Structures are given as C-alpha cells and as structure tokens.
Amino acid sequence: MIPFCRTPEEGKECLRVMAEHGLDRAKDKTLKVYVMCEIPSNVLLADEFLDVFDGMSIGSNDLTQLTLGLDRDSGIVTHIANEKDPSVKKLIAEVVKKCNERGKYVGICGQAPSDYPDFAEFLVDIGIQSMSLNPDTVIKTLLLVAEKERQPKK
C-alpha cells in the first residue's frame, strides 16, 4: 500500500522503484498494490490512479483533515474534524463508486466506522468492500453491517 501518493506519475515511480527491488507485478501476478486515498487529488483523479494501482484504501482521518483544511492534532478545531461532513462523505462516495465501476478493491481505514454506527451504514450503502474497526467495536459493527446488508436496496 502506497501512502500519500499525490499524482499518478508519482505512483508509477513508486511501482518502478518497487520493481527494482523485486516487487514487480509483471513478474508476480499475485502481487496487488493499492494506493491510500488520503488526499483530495486521489479522488479527483481516481480513474488515473486506478489505471496505475489495483485499488484504493481510503484513509478517512487524513482525507477529512486535508479536505476541511484542519490540523487534526489541534484541540481548537477537533470538534469540526468529522468524517460525517457532507464534503468528506461526497468524496468517499465518489471514490467508492469509481473503484466499484472499475472492478477494483476499495476499503476504508480510520476511526469513523468504529465511532459512528451511522457512518458504517453509509459505507455499506455506497458499496464499500471492507472497513477497519477498533477491536472493541468489531462485533457490534459486524452485526450492524449484516443487518444492513439483509435489507432491500433502495
């Protein structure tokens, strides 16, 4: 997984360096390389990134910080650093849609699915393929997701 990849060209360079050191998808068809979707440019250029990578893992904490222009370590603005912000949700929905349309992997890591059950439901609704969870929320969230997936699609 490649973090903070700003451009598709930078992604190609990462893959070139990986291949130089023996991690080459052309030689190992089982090797999958994903890009972290943490920067608004990853969403805006999702198709171009998906031409380079096998999928995306959404880093919701960083994507929220960079979308809203926040210092998430500052106590002054932590109350507005929330993945449930409409602009952040719109970006997440867009990248999930693009990945699913292209048949590519898309998951999410970050606090939001653990902290907000309604956010986990949102992720199921938009077609997320996987989500990371804090250990103390796994069972509760798995039950919520299972119930949500049993419901008819709207």
Region roles according to the model:
Residues 1-154:
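Conserved alpha/beta-domain cores
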